[in-house]
Swiss-Prot record:
GO molecular-function terms, A-Z: rRNA binding; structural constituent of ribosome
Cross-referenced InterPro entries: Ribosomal_uL4, Ribosomal_uL4-like, Ribosomal_uL4_dom_sf
Residues in coiled coil: none
Quaternary context: Part of the 50S ribosomal subunit.
Organism: Mesorhizobium japonicum (strain LMG 29417 / CECT 9101 / MAFF 303099) (Mesorhizobium loti (strain MAFF 303099))
Name the record gives this protein: Large ribosomal subunit protein uL4
Recorded superkingdom: Bacteria
Key words of the record: Ribonucleoprotein, Ribosomal protein, RNA-binding, rRNA-binding
Biological processes per GO annotation: translation
Family statement: Belongs to the universal ribosomal protein uL4 family.
Region annotated Disordered, chain positions: 63-94
Function recorded in the entry: One of the primary rRNA binding proteins, this protein initially binds near the 5'-end of the 23S rRNA. It is important during the early stages of 50S assembly. It makes multiple contacts with different domains of the 23S rRNA in the assembled 50S subunit and ribosome.
NCBIfam families on file: rplD_bact
């Protein structure tokens, strides 16, 4: 699969050959869904907590005698049926993280890249570098390329000026190649890869 390379200014800078094994797969939604669920589960805080009846600051004494009142039998006012009582089977602090095999995670990344390639939503840029950290200038460059909602993936180290300039642009995410992931690829409309990022992906899945 051949894709043209452009500069940040929108000029032609040659072509790059993309591997069919990485960018040419038929995307499987089930694999993408598994990887996204795994990612979001890892991010979930899990700090939810409700007090059970054993944790309520209230006397544990029996409310009234067992027999002779004509009322329902009760023990402590900590029970869940009473106002201010403990929650029955309430949420507890826990980790929502679950395991996902490495080969499924790797396959998920390939399918996410292939999904973007299939929808013609990949742009390859020769290098992500700016002489000055000017957000206004970078917005103009993105407008030339037709980018309003994109994930930009650079090489192992991002250009400092480019990273600073892109920080305040809404709906634009910038990550080094180490940070590429399925969720961020799918949540943005366009995937922008630097030439160095393409080479790193080819090397990673070789």
């Amino acid at each position: 699969m051949d894709l043209k390379i452009t500069t940040l200014g929108g000029k032609d800078a040659g072509k790059v050959k993309l591997s069919e094994e990485i960018f040419g797969l038929d995307p499987r939604e089930d694999i993408l869904q598994r990887v996204v669920r795994w990612q979001l589960a890892k991010k979930q805080q899990g700090t939810h907590k409700a007090k059970g009846r054993a944790e309520i600051a209230r006397t544990g004494a029996k409310m009234y005698k067992q027999k002779g009142t004509g009322r329902a039998r009760h023990h402590s006012a900590r029970a869940p049926q009473f106002r201010g009582g403990g929650k029955a089977h309430g949420p507890v602090v826990r980790s929502h993280e679950h395991d996902l095999p490495k080969n499924v995670r790797a396959l998920g990344l390939k399918h996410a890249l292939s999904a973007k390639a299939k929808s013609a939503s990949i742009i390859v840029i020769d290098e992500l570098k700016l002489t000055e950290a000017k957000t206004k200038a970078l917005i103009a460059n993105f407008a030339t390329l037709g980018l309003s909602n994109a994930l930009v993936i650079g090489g192992a180290e991002l250009d400092k000026n480019f990273k600073l300039a892109a920080t305040n642009i809404p709906n634009i995410d910038v990550l080094p190649i180490q940070g590429i992931n399925v969720y961020d690829i799918l949540r943005r409309g366009t995937l922008v890869l630097s030439k160095a990022a393409v080479e790193a992906l080819e090397e990673r899945f070789k």
